[in-house]
């Protein structure tokens, strides 16, 4: 593989990358305290996201009412006293007449100092990838390990009722013209130390990073050999994958973990002569079903240096549904 050129991977790695999954394109239902149901959207990604109703930014106030946003304060939207679905929408509401365009919060900054794999220097065409499955004391897994093994590795894998969708391995083999063969070793389900909501997106990322480190330590204690996952010989595990029980926060419930790629920072650890730092986290489920390869391939793409190609302010569709690093991460979920 040393003489093989990957022009797309090299070119895209020059861009500034956001490293997370785009929010679900499907609305979901919430209830106001009076019982009224609203169909709303979550927008953005793991660094900047907000909720919308009929295109207007909304927030939940301290009394659990969904209200229209009145402004932006850094990484937060400000709540008005105008209730969604009850009071007039901003373009017909004198109390919100100062809103002249989309209200979008500022983005978080999530540092990622892990090196990008050097695909010129990989040992051969096979790129070995570890995958850890994580469940919680109060939120167990639904699907067996064998289901993930098929999703990641089985040639000709079929997802739900779609024909010949292919596996994670099939996808990367096809787009590389047979020159990049992912070989994913899927673990058993490991139990997290804390309950599900402790690691939720609404509690920040440090708890998730600690969870990743704990899972790495658990595998090391079980005799795992990390050295075989340094494909380019730079002393780092190239792309640690994890999947957690349940759906991701990108579907609207921010007590879940938002799918993303990052690094462990000061929690990085060296086992078997290689350092484990780079990781990506994915959900077990999407839209109520078993997860599709889209989000897994998307986050893994970040580990290879690929940028997000969606538009985070929704002024355009970005690269669209057929691009893995745009809305393609939702392919075969029933949303597109």
Per-range role (PLM):
Residues 1-22:
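Bacterial Sec-dependent N-terminal signal peptides
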Residues 8, 37, 45-49, 313, ...:
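A broad, structure-centric signal for solvent-exposed, well-ordered loop/edge residues
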Residues 19-278:
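Zymogen propeptides/activation segments of proteases
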